Amino acid sequence: MSSAFDFEPQPRRASVAVDVGGVIVGGGAPVVVQSMTNTDTADIDATVAQVAALHKAGSELVRITVDRDESAAAVPKIRERLLRLGIDVPLVGDFHYIGHKLLADHPACAEALAKYRINPGNVGFKDKKDKQFAEIIEMAIRYDKPVRIGVNWGSLDQELLTRLMDANQANGSPLTAQQVMRETIVQSALLSAELAEELGLPRSRIILSAKVSGVQDLIAVYAMLAARSVHALHLGLTEAGMGTKGIVASSASLGILMQQGIGDTIRISLTPEPGGDRTREVQVAQELLQVMGFRQFIPVVAACPGCGRTTSTVFQELAQKIQEDIRASMPVWREKYPGVEALKVAVMGCIVNGPGESKHADIGISLPGTGEMPAAPVFIDGQKALTLRGPKIAEDFQLLVADYIEKRFGHGQAAAE
């Protein structure tokens, strides 16, 4: 085992840039956040509402299911409705089994979509496979659309898997079944991309993905793909699960890959709680990119975890309130206060780390812990600015944060500069 540990992120892997409806994926562009609806695409009202919500949350690409004629017919109407709302987010069509037929029968759908997602494992079977794959590629060429060749181990090409398993058995030093499965996933993606290029689709119109549900498997297959291709890569852990488990599994796998410079666009595939908010997956994707230092989307609120010194819940409530206000305000703030996403706010619960952490923030407050004087020093740009006292410390600090944002990022600051 090597004793060397490279703690810095590796340079981004060189990949071919792909233009997806005006959003650049790969080629050194910032890692793109995308999401997927779970509405019936034929339900235009519901799909428009969810796409709008995902876009507002920060999704830069939104994938929708196109599984039957009614869904395909709805796509151009959804696109038109979104544009009337001022929402120009690129829509990605998710096709399985009959994508070739739907694109041919619904040219308006083919035109309205910004990208087509193809699954090599179910695009067609036996002698129909290459023919139906070719038909989708021909449509992509006709309408000048990129495709994502998305392999998923739950629908893996069984013919290819069988062939590689048989070849492995004949090998004097056979691989494990897991290793053969990983190789099958990678070959399925690479062979499909090779065929697409032979059919005339340029490399600048191809994105690859290879999704599995195991963290170690995902890291392995993407490392293999990255080493054996220059295609832009879409990262995602499929069937990640619900709640904390899904967030941890996705963050662990995608975080490791991105630290190695691998990945051009990501989706956090969370199973929402019944009645849960679909935009949660967008928030998690943004937070992952932000905490790793790859992108900035929203001001950071640093808050201590609490301990026996902080029996009061005031600092927790204040931190939560500020975080909620920031997220709700960001759609307006992005336009009104350019650069505000770099802001750091600290809300600390006692004297131990409170003043120090607050000094490191742009604006911070150190609330009194158990047994401490009922006073809260506020630090602005590293200096103690004032001390808040009384029953409205939380409200007063929120006003100070709003005032700081206006002065630093508002028009007044721009004029002063």
From Swiss-Prot:
What are the names of the required cofactors? [4Fe-4S] cluster
The UniProt function text for this chain reads:
Converts 2C-methyl-D-erythritol 2,4-cyclodiphosphate (ME-2,4cPP) into 1-hydroxy-2-methyl-2-(E)-butenyl 4-diphosphate.
BP-aspect Gene Ontology terms: isopentenyl diphosphate biosynthetic process, methylerythritol 4-phosphate pathway; terpenoid biosynthetic process
Q: Can you name this protein?
A: 4-hydroxy-3-methylbut-2-en-1-yl diphosphate synthase (flavodoxin)
Per UniProt, where does [4Fe-4S] cluster bind?
A: 304, 307, 350, 357
Stored HAMAP family: IspG (MF_00159)
Please provide the record's keywords in A-Z order.
Answer: 4Fe-4S, Iron, Iron-sulfur, Isoprene biosynthesis, Metal-binding, Oxidoreductase
Show the GO MF annotations.
Answer: 4 iron, 4 sulfur cluster binding; 4-hydroxy-3-methylbut-2-en-1-yl diphosphate synthase activity (ferredoxin); 4-hydroxy-3-methylbut-2-enyl-diphosphate synthase activity (flavodoxin); iron ion binding
What is the protein's species of origin? Rhizobium meliloti (strain 1021)
Q: Which NCBIfam families match?
A: ispG_gcpE (TIGR00612), PRK00366.1 (NF001540)
Enzyme Commission designation: 1.17.7.3
What Pfam families has UniProt attached to this entry? Answer: GcpE
Q: Which domain of life is it from?
A: Bacteria
What does the sequence similarity comment in the record state about its family? Belongs to the IspG family.
